[in-house]
C-alpha cells in the first residue's frame, strides 16, 4: 500500500484514488517504513493525523501535501512511463524519501507528538496501537532513518501480539461475514438498534 509507495522516489496517482494507512483500525501500525517516510513528506502533525485516524485522503489532497507528485488521468501505466520520461528529460534524479528532512526541520515536532498523545488519551483511552503509532512517528524525527525503521519494527511487533489487535481483526472479519449470510434474502430491510 502507501507504505511501499512512500519509499519510492516519485509517486503518481489517478485523481479518483484514495491513499491512507488504515492499519491502526486493525490494532497495528503501518510497517515497511510508513511511519518513518510519511512524516518526511507531509510533516509530523499531518502524518500523525493520517496514521492515528487510519482514514484515507483523496489523491488531490495527497498531491497538495506532497505524498503524490503527479495526478494523471487515463491509463496509469502509460502515464507512469510518460512521467518517468519527463523526469529524465528534465534531468531529475533519485529523490530518496528517507533522506528528506525539509518537513521535519524547523518545526516543533515534540509539541505535535504531545498534542496527539493527549488527544488519544481523551478520545481513545486505553487503545494500544494509536500510542504505538505516535511513538513510531516520534522516531522519524528523533532518530536516524535506520534506527527509526528498527523502532518501527519493534513497535509493530508489540502491536502484533496485542489482544486488542486480535479482537479488532476478529471484529473486522466478523462484520464482513455477517453481511454475507447465505440464506438471508437480499431485500431484507436493515433495522437500526440502539443497544443489544
What do the predicted segments below correspond to?
Residues 24, 29-37, 129-137, 159-160:
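Long, contiguous hydrophobic alpha-helical segments, chiefly transmembrane helices and signal peptides
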Residues 157-166, 173:
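Long amphipathic alpha-helix in the N-terminal Rossmann-like dinucleotide-binding domain
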Residues 194-196:
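Phosphate-binding active sites in nucleotide-utilizing proteins
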Residues 19, 168-170:
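Short, well-ordered strand-loop elements centered on a beta-strand within folded domains, enriched
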Amino acid at each position: 500500500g502507501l507504505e511501499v509507495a512512500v519509499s519510492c522516489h516519485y509517486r503518481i496517482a489517478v485523481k479518483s484514488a484514495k491513499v491512507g494507512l488504515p492499519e491502526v483500525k486493525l490494532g497495528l501500525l503501518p510497517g515497511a517504513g510508513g511511519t518513518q517516510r510519511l512524516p518526511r513528506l507531509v510533516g509530523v502533525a499531518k502524518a500523525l493525523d493520517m496514521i492515528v485516524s487510519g482514514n484515507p485522503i483523496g489523491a488531490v489532497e495527497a498531491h497538495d501535501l506532497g505524498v503524490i507528485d503527479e495526478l494523471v488521468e487515463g491509463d496509469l501505466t502509460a502515464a507512469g512511463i510518460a512521467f518517468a520520461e519527463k523526469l529524465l528529460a528534465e534531468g531529475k534524479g533519485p529523490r530518496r524519501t528517507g533522506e528528506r528532512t525539509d518537513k521535519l526541520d524547523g518545526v516543533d515536532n515534540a509539541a505535535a507528538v504531545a498534542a496527539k498523545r493527549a488527544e488519544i488519551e481523551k478520545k481513545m483511552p486505553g487503545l494500544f496501537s494509536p500510542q504505538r503509532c505516535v511513538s513510531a512517528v516520534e522516531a522519524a524525527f528523533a532518530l536516524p532513518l535506520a534506527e527509526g525503521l528498527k523502532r518501527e519494527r519493534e513497535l509493530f511487533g508489540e502491536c502484533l501480539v496485542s489482544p486488542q489487535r486480535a479482537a479488532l481483526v476478529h471484529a473486522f472479519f466478523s462484520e464482513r461475514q455477517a453481511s454475507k449470510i447465505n440464506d438471508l434474502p437480499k431485500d431484507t430491510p436493515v433495522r437500526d438498534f440502539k443497544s443489544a
